[in-house]
Amino acid sequence: MDSTSQPLVDPRLRRVVAGVLAFWAVGLVLAEVVVQVAAGAAVLVAIILAARRSLRLAPDVRAYVAASLALCAWQLASPAVALLTGAAQRWPRSSRYGQVLDTVAGAAAACIGTVGVPWLLLAGVVAGGWLVATGLGMLQNRVRWSWEPPAFFKLNLSRLHENFGTEESPRYASGGFFFHRLRFAHGAIAALGPALAVLGGSELARRRGLAGLVVLGMLLSIYNAFARAALGAALIVSVVALLLLVQGRARKAGLVVLGVLVLVVVVSPAWRARMAKAVGNIYGGERQLAMSVGWELVREHPLAGVGFGNHKPAAMATAERTGINDFLATDAHNVWLTVWAETGLVGLLLFACMHVLLARALIRRHREGSLAATGALLSWVGFQVLALVHYLPFHSNVHLSFALIWGLGLCEGSGVLRGETPAASPLPASVGPAARS
């Protein structure tokens, strides 16, 4: 869609959308409740735009939105189906069932982004927020945290007291403002993609320099959080970014930096211990137990599943036979397996369709030069890596962080990576005249 064909937008609506997106960006580093409120507001604004027939979406974005809505609808209905088929004995907890909103959050971000996106504001909020969070994480890593936040924030102080070092030389788990090392580290993977895209693709040296600091801060935060899967995902995403965005000396320099990070991990006693435990965790440990129970649920209810949000009670029903405990029963420690266990083959196919359509739309925009799409595509790669060993939607702040990045990757005016746009095809929304302003 050419930008000249866009209808005039109410300035008040532009301000509302800018406020929602900025609030969402703040939540990426601050608190889960912030991203939940922002995502809910985005869904509401998207519904208003659709009701007013004001949405103008590219065909591939429209397909992604439709797939997201279809998956959300099935998630909403699946507990009732599970009750009717006898696969479940009760309705899921409201907090877990309410996470259906997260499924359409990325689509909502893409929809409201058609009104306009304050790119520099969002970039400044995310970059500044992550630099501050990195500093806080460094302090948490070295000093046993003593200040207890108000109960209203529902932050678990004990998560910051996990010592991965020794009594003589303690190394505590960084949790940033989330006070939770996995929320902190997995959220970093969501935002790492855009930072790498700016670092490798921006034409302005100052922006590349700032993006470089943010990338180093995120890598340091993941290192200090002792998050093994997140570190592996960060390395993979960084290598993909180097292959996509830079060549020659720049690529070699990037590989050297990653090599130094790997060396630091190897020489760290705390990290060596963490990596040694990872092997036992996958082969015969807690993660293998959780996955085996997930597969058992799939075998028992392959088509419709046990109902969205019902993995825990269904898994606990096997406790006497499998030995699963309350902590491990929450999910199958794998996104795809948990989706299959909860929503059956129907939900799995819808979930796969949604991600394939998202990836296709992002790849097309990356090839046409969209900076935001490139960052979102890298973020999508990180999500898929983490999804192999974690059920990321369990932490809404993590899932909604990815959703915001993906939605923005489908929006207009995201800038270009290369100096010129291919002339063989019409200008897409993401690289139209507004993108160069």
Each model region followed by its residue ranges:
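A membrane-periplasm/extracellular boundary helix in multi-pass inner-membrane enzymes
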Residues: 73, 135, 139, 225, ...
